[in-house]
């Protein structure tokens, strides 16, 4: 009873999560959006099944198909059958292909396993499903999966694949096998290489005419022997003897979900001879094949890998002004998970880059993780029917603006605070962008160093700053007063690298103000252009005012 209650709760939670992300569209808008995406997916289906080609990555197709189903459920439409091929000239399967139900996570897998025993795990090989029929020891028929009941006659094509045994003996002499035709790979590491659109490539080779030589790049992984030996070990041994060696090599007995998770992770990182998109867990005990029906297999489930890239909906476009005055564009996203990381924002880049991408709220973009886990945009995979893009702010900012606070300077001013508090500058631990915004909103800073005047009481009474952290923050602000002169000059935004500034041997504000352009130009990595920028910087009225203010605060190097 507890098991079924847990399953019911999981279903309700899943339904709630689906409904929680339903778009706020009018019925007319919903009909238009659903119709447009439906037509596009139908076109991709036609290309895939009739022409053997694919204009879209497998992962993108799968996720957009899921998005369409979600929209249809949200607005009361009938969900479509995913990847339903045409039935022209179809051949009946001796045993139906059941398909496999997907588990959302390890907890769901554990629930499914509780009432089952003698379980085995296999890689979920990424290719196209096929039925192999052997009669009197010879390959008699090969049938594509189709709709699970009927498929295309692929006998001629499969007979040209050298990796598929054309003759068998013993228990397999009169047998029906189900498996996956896949693209042979040498040392494919799924974690690093991804799916490489393997499914579409295999489908293309099987659908095209006159490509007998290229068919030898294919092989088959048998994952089911309906009405075969009762013991899995016997099945695997007979299949290996007949030439289906991969099945025995990549089928392991498992006892619990933790063990499956370890194998799943191992295969994700290992060099394999095929592309995979997860694992399949199956019970050795199966019903008689006459009871097999599409969508009704209770003896096996799949646990797919988290996609390397996720399709995410753009919720908003936001503009940020950095400390140098450059405007950058950020896309706010409906949350997606990438490698256990929740991604809600992605940096697009400059305004020009954003305009080149042509991204608007409501669009669907493909997001992955670049180096150090930073989200990046790979592609715009779908644009909404109604698109309204915000107007970027005027480009009135530069490297010498917004040292002092004003309404128009809000974003660049905050960026300057974040910069000066970073580890490489003043090293103010425990405060980031949100903390600076809270302090500025409450205490209305005059300039970027106004925080030096805050008292412990003011910090303690700042909304958004935890009282337990206020004392620590005040301590950090006081410690900053003892930072070296060069750190304070960096906080003021001098256009030099730290190495060049240290090489200058400048140790006082008055000395720095009297240094000539020729002096700066002789520093390592500092040409004439950079030297002129330093002169412009130190002669700026805001910079001079800040220098005088720091002198009044008796900051090292600024004293008269």
Swiss-Prot record:
The keyword DNA damage applies. Disulfide bonds: none annotated. The active site is at 124 (n6-amp-lysine intermediate). Keywords: DNA damage, DNA repair, DNA replication, Ligase, NAD. Coiled coil: none annotated. Gene3D superfamilies: DNA ligase/mRNA capping enzyme (3.30.470.30), Helix hairpin bin (1.10.287.610), Nucleic acid-binding proteins (2.40.50.140). Its EC number is 6.5.1.2. PROSITE patterns: DNA_LIGASE_N1 (PS01055), DNA_LIGASE_N2 (PS01056). It comes from the Bacteria. Catalyzes the formation of phosphodiester linkages between 5'-phosphoryl and 3'-hydroxyl groups in double-stranded DNA using NAD as a coenzyme and as the energy source for the reaction. This is DNA ligase B. The gene is ligB.
């Amino acid at each position: 009873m507890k098991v079924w209650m847990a399953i019911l709760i999981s279903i309700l939670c899943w339904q709630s999560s689906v409904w929680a992300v339903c778009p706020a569209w009018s019925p007319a808008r919903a009909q238009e959006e659903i119709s447009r995406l439906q037509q596009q997916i139908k076109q991709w289906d036609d290309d895939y099944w009739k022409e053997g080609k694919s204009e879209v990555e497998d992962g993108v197709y799968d996720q957009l198909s899921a998005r369409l189903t979600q929209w249809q459920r949200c607005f009361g439409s009938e969900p479509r059958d995913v990847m339903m091929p045409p039935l022209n000239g179809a051949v009946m399967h001796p045993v139906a292909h059941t398909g496999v139900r997907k588990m959302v996570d390890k907890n769901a897998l554990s629930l499914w396993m509780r009432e089952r025993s003698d379980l085995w795990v296999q890689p979920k090989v990424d290719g196209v499903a096929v039925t192999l029929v052997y009669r009197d020891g010879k390959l008699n028929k090969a049938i594509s999966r189709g709709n699970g009941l009927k498929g295309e006659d692929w006998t001629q094509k499969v007979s040209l694949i050298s990796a598929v045994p054309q003759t068998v003996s013993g228990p397999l002499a009169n047998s029906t096998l189900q498996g996956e035709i896949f693209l042979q790979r040498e040392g494919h590491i799924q974690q690093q290489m991804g799916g490489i659109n393997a499914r579409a490539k295999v489908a293309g080779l099987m659908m095209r005419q006159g490509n007998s030589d290229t068919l030898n790049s294919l092989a088959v992984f048998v994952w089911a022997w309906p009405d075969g030996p009762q013991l899995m070990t016997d099945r695997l041994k007979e299949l290996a003897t007949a030439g289906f060696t991969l099945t025995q090599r990549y089928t392991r007995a498992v006892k619990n979900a933790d063990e499956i998770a370890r194998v799943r992770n191992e295969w994700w990182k290992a060099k394999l001879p095929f592309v995979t998109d997860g694992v399949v867990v199956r019970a050795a005990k199966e019903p008689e094949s006459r009871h097999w029906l599409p969508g009704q297999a209770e003896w096996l489930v799949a646990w797919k890998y988290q996609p390397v890239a996720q399709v995410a909906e753009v919720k908003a476009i936001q503009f940020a002004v950095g400390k140098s005055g450059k405007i950058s564009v950020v896309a706010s996203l409906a949350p997606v998970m990438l490698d256990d990381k929740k991604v809600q924002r992605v940096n697009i880049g400059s305004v020009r880059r954003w305009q080149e991408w042509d991204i608007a709220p409501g669009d669907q973009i493909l997001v992955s993780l670049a180096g150090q886990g930073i989200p990046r945009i790979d592609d715009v995979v779908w644009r909404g029917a109604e698109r309204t893009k915000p107007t970027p702010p005027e480009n009135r900012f530069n490297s010498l603006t917004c040292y002092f606070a004003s309404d128009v300077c809000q974003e660049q001013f905050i960026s300057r605070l974040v910069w000066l508090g970073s580890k490489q500058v003043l090293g103010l631990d425990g405060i980031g962008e949100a903390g600076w915004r809270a302090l500025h909103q409450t205490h209305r800073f005059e300039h970027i160093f106004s925080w030096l005047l805050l008292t412990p009481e003011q910090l303690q009474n700042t909304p958004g700053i935890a009282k337990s952290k206020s004392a620590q923050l005040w301590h950090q602000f006081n410690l900053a007063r003892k930072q070296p002169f060069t750190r304070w000059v960096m906080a003021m935004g001098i256009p030099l690298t730290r190495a060049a500034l240290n090489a200058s041997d400048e140790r006082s504000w008055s000395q720095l103000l009297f240094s000539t352009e020729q002096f700066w130009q002789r520093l390592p990595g500092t040409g004439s252009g950079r030297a002129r920028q330093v002169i412009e910087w130190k002669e700026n009225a805001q910079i001079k005012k800040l220098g005088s203010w720091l002198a009044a605060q008796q900051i090292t190097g600024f004293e008269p």
